[in-house]
A protein has these predicted regions:
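The catalytic Nudix box helix
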Residues: 29-63
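Active-site segment of metal-dependent pyrophosphate-handling enzymes
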Residues: 2, 49-86
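Nucleotide phosphate-binding site architecture
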Residues: 13, 35, 104
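NUDIX/MutT-family hydrolases
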Residues: 78-82, 87-122
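Helical scaffold of the NTase/Pol beta-like nucleotidyltransferase catalytic core
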Residues: 123-129
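N-terminal strand-loop-strand
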Residues: 1-28, 83
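Short loop/turn microsegments at loop-to-beta-strand junctions
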Residues: 1-2, 39, 93
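Short aromatic/basic micro-patch
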Residues: 28, 73, 96-97
Length: 129
């Protein structure tokens, strides 16, 4: 999987998973599966376009995380990107822009907490206020 933490005006984007899907109702950073012909970066650019209608270029690679859920395992390539405009933003699911301090108000999949820890380890505190 490839996931991107998207920042806009010091806030980050969370999208709520559909209730009828696995981990339904939880909030997460946008992203998705990597197709067999794609690089991790190409996948995250495609997924962000599909999920948000935002066209991002040159997302910064942060690293990989692994997480074992009860019935499946994920390996996630994490990227981050600051955007200057959200005029083209179109999201079908519920979404919100929040500060990292506001994240505790939302139920996130466990893997998302590992992503936040990875961002902190990579000196991204300027985004994690």
């Amino acid at each position: 999987m490839s996931v991107c933490v998207i920042y806009y005006k010091s806030k980050l984007l969370l999208i709520q998973r559909p209730e009828d899907k696995m981990l339904g109702g939880l909030w997460e950073f946008p992203g998705g599966k990597i197709e067999s012909h794609e690089s991790d970066e190409a996948a995250v650019i495609r997924e962000i376009k599909e999920e948000t209608n935002l066209l991002i270029k040159n997302p910064r690679y942060v690293g990989k995380i692994k997480h074992q859920y009860s019935h499946f395992k994920v390996v996630i390539s994490l990227f981050q990107k600051s955007v200057n405009s959200i005029k083209s933003l179109k999201i079908k699911e519920n979404y919100i822009w929040t500060t990292t301090k506001g994240l505790d108000k939302f139920a996130l999949p466990k893997a998302n907490y590992k992503m936040l820890d990875l961002l902190k380890k990579n000196n991204d505190e300027k985004y994690l206020k």
